[in-house]
From Swiss-Prot:
Homodimer. This is Pyridoxine/pyridoxamine 5'-phosphate oxidase. Catalyzes the oxidation of either pyridoxine 5'-phosphate (PNP) or pyridoxamine 5'-phosphate (PMP) into pyridoxal 5'-phosphate (PLP). One of its GO terms (molecular function) is pyridoxamine phosphate oxidase activity. Substrate binds at residues 7-10, 66, 123, 127, 131, 191-193. PANTHER family: PYRIDOXINE-5'-PHOSPHATE OXIDASE, PYRIDOXINE-5-PHOSPHATE OXIDASE. FMN binds at residues 61-66, 76-77, 83, 105, 140-141, 185, 195. PROSITE patterns: PYRIDOX_OXIDASE. Belongs to the pyridoxamine 5'-phosphate oxidase family. It holds the Pfam family PNPOx_N.
Length: 212
């Protein structure tokens, strides 16, 4: 397979300094809304979460953005999972949105802070009951003998909680990533991409154009 021969050109647009919001969260919101309105992405909220464990080994996976504001960017997971363990050992993480049909990427670096029980309960019980039961049934990242074993356990729990509220597992909850740095990337012709980095300077954000 000759991957080196594969070529594509970027030409959907450009990104100029005067087009940027002074506030990176507002810039993120602008691009997120455009991504949603484009109907070109199956899920614009899907983002790569990169973590590093105590042995300095990196790992990454796709999670879903469930909310954001000037405090940070929120997602939910099983805290006993690989990513949860990584975050407990090293809260410095990176988020990455790859909106390839729009020739855009957003990178965010920050610290992941656990959400409180009230927030976790509120979101957990807003989910479909089937999803709540699935969270209860799965010991995420642990070995399982077969799919049948997992399905059988799930169906048993689904029956148990058919007419009662599903308790949120203590291992299930969310994190808020407090951003320290953003980068907005727009594909450009001849690989001369437009890149802008937002870096926190005390209470303000400093915007720097980066070479592609």
């Amino acid at each position: 397979m000759d991957l080196q021969a594969m070529r594509r050109e970027y030409g959907l647009g450009s990104l100029h300094r005067e087009q940027l919001e002074a506030d990176p969260v507002k810039q993120f919101e602008k691009w997120m809304q455009q991504a949603i309105d484009s109907n070109l992405l199956s899920d614009p909220t899907a983002m790569t979460l990169a973590t590093v464990d105590a042995e300095h080994m990196p790992s990454q996976r796709i999670v879903l953005l469930k909310g954001y504001d000037h405090t940070g960017f929120r997602f939910y997971t099983n805290k006993n999972s690989h990513k949860g363990q990584d975050i407990s050992e090293n809260p410095q993480v990176a988020l990455h949105f790859a909106w390839l049909p729009l020739e855009r990427q957003i990178s965010i670096i920050g610290s992941a802070v656990p959400l409180d029980d009230d927030d976790n309960d509120r979101y957990f019980h807003s989910r479909p009951k089937e999803s709540q039961v699935a969270a209860l049934a799965s010991q995420q990242s642990r070995p399982v003998e077969s799919r049948d074993v997992l399905e059988s356990h799930y169906q048993s729990l689904l029956k148990d909680y058919e007419n009662t509220e599903v308790p949120r597992p203590q291992s299930w909850g969310g994190y808020c990533v407090h951003p320290k740095q953003f980068e907005f990337w727009q594909g450009g012709q001849h690989r001369l991409h437009d890149r802008y980095q937002y870096s926190k300077d005390r209470e303000n954000w400093r915007i720097t154009r980066l070479q592609p």
